[in-house]
């Protein structure tokens, strides 16, 4: 995944508009749109500001140490964090029951 795709995906995951990002970084909307379209690259200073605004590290933004699969998982976790407490508890309960089910199946399959 290219940086332009990570910019757009992460921005959408945290429910920010391109205009909000441009404002937080202190650049024009046109400049920010060029980053997401791949027509322009941010300066190092702006890269730091973008990572902060996107609530991720520069390494994550640049795709370092993160597989696409891990990045997708992180985006999902960040979306879950935006849910209210009751919705988060419901997801936690479903996840816990799936993990128990998986463990039980694993024990039964290896014990047979």
From Swiss-Prot:
**What region holds the HTH cro/C1-type domain?**
7-61
Top-rank taxon of the source lineage equals: Bacteria
Question: CDD domains this protein is in?
Answer: HTH_XRE
DNA-binding interval(s): 18-37
* Keyword Ubl conjugation belongs to the record: no
| GO MF term list | DNA binding
What InterPro entries does the entry give? Answer: Cro/C1-type_HTH, Lambda_DNA-bd_dom_sf, RstR
- Record bears the keyword Zinc-finger: no
Database matches in Gene3D superfamilies: lambda repressor-like DNA-binding domains (1.10.260.40)
The alphabetized UniProt keywords are:
DNA-binding, Repressor, Transcription, Transcription regulation
Physiological role: Transcriptional repressor of the integrated CTXPhi phage gene rstA2.
The protein in question is named Cryptic phage CTXphi transcriptional repressor RstR
């Amino acid at each position: 995944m290219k940086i332009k795709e990570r910019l757009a995906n992460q921005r959408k995951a945290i429910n920010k508009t391109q205009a909000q990002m441009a404002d937080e970084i202190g650049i024009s909307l046109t400049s920010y749109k060029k980053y997401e379209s791949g027509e322009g690259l941010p300066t190092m200073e702006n890269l730091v500001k973008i990572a902060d605004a996107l609530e991720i590290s520069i390494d994550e933004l640049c795709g370092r140490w993160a597989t696409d699969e891990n990045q997708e998982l992180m985006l999902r976790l960040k979306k879950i964090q935006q849910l209210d407490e009751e919705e988060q508890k419901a997801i936690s309960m479903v996840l816990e029951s799936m993990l128990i089910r998986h463990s039980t199946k694993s024990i039964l399959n290896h014990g047979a």
